[in-house]
Amino acid sequence: AINNTVDRVHQSMEAFIHNMNTIHSRGGNQVVFSSINYGTDTSAEGRMVIEELLKATIEGLGTRGEVPVFPIQIFKIKDGVSYSEADYKRAMEDFDAAMEGKVEFEAPNFDLFLKACRTTAKALFPNFMFLDTPFNQHEKWDASDPKRYRYELATMGCRTRVFENLNGEKTSLGRGNLSFTTMNL
């Protein structure tokens, strides 16, 4: 049953990437400029989605494996969740074994971090965001909170940091861009 589920999730991630790169719905002739942030979900289901999205990204689009531009992918790095210095040292001791899943790590998603690095090397995405950087931290973030994503920074597109809020709680939920503006000076 689990193999069937993995196959279905993989096919869903392939479809997601395909649709984000082919559905023309912006002004009738552009694909949706889309972004997805991930890397901190440690549930079995969340890990499966992340892993299959990374695999589908490496496979690329079509029979030639064209690198997908969308969605812009951002892998969130959080100490103790998707990274630890001890795990880094352990992975560097036997990198091939680490990449093959033969090394035990402390951080539950460190293996996904390694796979994200491999994916970036082959397909340019995901980008990486460090949640422990002082200006990206949220005082309410707690590793034991199943809804900790409410207190995680997110980015949209190539560069828009969605987090701070002048008129309410600091969160990335329910926030986004309505329009872009270009100024030629």
Q: In which residue ranges do the predicted regions lie?
A:
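Conserved catalytic cores of very large enzyme subunits
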Residues: A1-L185
